[in-house]
Amino acid sequence: RMGALLAMRRLERPEIAQFLHDEDSLLVTEAARAINDVPIQAATRDLANLTDDKNLSEPAWRRVVNANFRLGREEYAQQLGAIAVNESIEANIRVEALQALADWGSPSGRDRVTGIWSPLAGYRSIEDARRAVQSAMPQLADHRFQNLTSALIDAVQAVKLETASAWLLGTLRNDELSDSTRSDALEALAQLAESALVNEAVQFALEKGSKKLQREALRWQAQSADSLQAIKFALEGEDIQGQQAAIASLARDTTQEAMDLTGKLMTQLVSEELSGALSLDVIELVEER
């Protein structure tokens, strides 16, 4: 049977899809490789629809995910969502399904598995991916697996799923997650949510977050007297990254007090009283003014 499969691969025969249902997992994997890697486009739908087989190898699963991504229609976005929530599938494959949904609206010209240049043709609706992510949210929202949570944040942000704002805030508040994951949640929230919710998230991060979260919060802090006070506090600290974030935040503040603070930083730069690590940040700040 392997000989027949390899012959079909060489001839690029769509009948190779029959091996996707073989009892020998090695043959199933080789058929999936042939359909995706050659590629044998006439059999791509057969590969994409292999989502009910729980015994697939990781290489086969990666190609199933890729087939659904490449076909690019609503039903295939939904199948990626189904893979993402299927707990019988390895977490890294579920993450890959979410990443595919995140990339749905702006696919790379290279194949996700082989890296070969193979640009996708035809219209792809980001709304299809948005609906798939929204359908998957209830089963992925419990933060049990941090890599899935991170991938879900990326997908939510990419498809602009505004209804996930409350979940993003809850993710930010979850101190069992890594700073990186919580920081990503804050960034996504800042780009999706209404200002009141963003302000609540920023205030939480500034008051109770780690230095990394505080730096991220400074980036999204709304213009106010309190925000300028937070910027000054960060500039007086010893955390270089925090100071850089404060300078970047200062660029968005158009008040006279912010202008005065910019002038003070420039004076420190000229008189060499400013840390060399901040010189470029201050120069860029002045140029933006």
Stretch-by-stretch model annotation:
Residues 1-13, 18-19, 28-40, 49, ...:
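Structural detector for internal amphipathic alpha-helices that build alpha-solenoid repeat scaffolds
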Residues 13, 44, 77, 129-134, ...:
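Core helices of alpha-solenoid repeat scaffolds
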Residues 110:
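Short acidic/His/Gly/Ser-rich catalytic and metal-binding motifs that mark active-site loops
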Residues 136-139:
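Amphipathic alpha-helices of TPR/Sel1-like and other helical repeat/solenoid scaffolds
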